[in-house]
A protein has these predicted regions:
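Negatively charged, low-complexity tracts enriched in Asp/Glu with abundant Ser/Thr
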Residues: 1-28
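A short, structured beta-strand/loop element
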Residues: 30-59
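Compositionally biased, intrinsically disordered low-complexity regions enriched in proline and serine
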Residues: 12, 17, 22, 39-42, ...
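Acidic, low-complexity intrinsically disordered segments
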Residues: 2-4, 9, 48-86
Length: 86
């Protein structure tokens, strides 16, 4: 889990501030594709939203050869979702 700059999320008729980003590898074929599931939580770790991301191509090559693939994946996922890690 990573802290993010607050993002407004509409949930069940109210606006909440997501401040936590979690990214989980759901599948990696270890060749050219990785699927992630992401979650956004508020400060109380209440899940506000979830979704999926697919990492392929040059991004996958960089991810799979990175000495810190977890950090790369979080930064890549945050960029895809227009989130800012703190």
């Amino acid at each position: 889990m990573k802290q993010i700059q607050p993002v407004s999320i509409w949930y069940n008729g109210q606006i909440y501030q997501a401040t936590i980003f979690n990214l989980v590898s759901a599948f990696d074929n270890l060749v050219d594709t990785c699927f992630f599931t992401y979650y956004l939580y508020d400060n109380a770790q209440f899940q506000l939203t979830t979704g999926s991301l697919t990492l392929t191509g040059a991004d996958y090559t960089t991810y799979s050869s990175s000495p810190d693939s977890n950090s790369y994946a979080y930064q890549w996922g945050a960029t895809q979702l227009n989130l800012t890690l703190v």
